Amino acid sequence: MKCFERLVLAHLKTCLPPTLDPFQFAYRKNRSKEDAISTALHSALSHLDNNNSYVRMLFIDFSSAFNTVIPSKLITKLSHLGINTSLCNWILDFLSNRPQSVRVENHTSSTLILNTGVPQGCVLSPLLYSLFTYDCTPVHGSNTIVKFADDTTVIGLISDNDESAYREEVQHLAVWCADNNLALNTKKTKELIVDFRKKAGTHIPIHINGMEVERVASFKFLGVHISEDLSWTLNTSSLVKKAHQRLFFLRRLKKAHLSPQILENFYRCTIESILTNCRSNLL
């Protein structure tokens, strides 16, 4: 089945219009996680060059995002994107009436029929989710919504202490989530404020669905630690610590007299990959 899904995936990509949201970086040709991080940081840094300005970054957390997609809504959006009816009907049939059961050793639960969500581990699911959220775009030009699969970040560029556009954007996003059956987890949603002004005032917290969003000094965004001073100290320390821990295993392998080729492969896969992760953002 996965082989056929790959064929459908390749065909679906050729049917997509070039006008898709440019700030969705997952599962798009010539786009990557590094591009999403660079875009977010460039947007913030460029704005901070202006007088009396600061940036609020809201890192949205969804509860089981893939499991809450409503197939009928997805098909409607695919139709708006110009996907032909035959392909839409196939996708709807693929996502509907899916039997599911749980097996533990020799015991199997009763079968449950699912009509909501895109199955995790499915070849098509990541792209289908990205297309489901294609219309999650900012309503104000002073805001940017950066998306990478189900990781969504609202970047509010604030000038002269006027946060009205940013706060309206957050409320608009909350309404969009409710309309699209996505459960916005306010407890795990975090906000980071970058304010280099000498006389920065007190920042009023953001509330979503009546619950206050926690403000943090740093946040791990797509694997990279971003701090409120926009320095790389925390991220670098974290990478070095992680690499140092894995060096212990490399030493153990060396003591076991494994071949240099195996040791080199282990180093490149488990240590060098950490140190070079998102290195373009550090340059």
Predicted region positions:
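Non-catalytic, peripheral interaction segments enriched in hydrophobic/basic residues
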Residues: 148-149, 178-202, 223-283
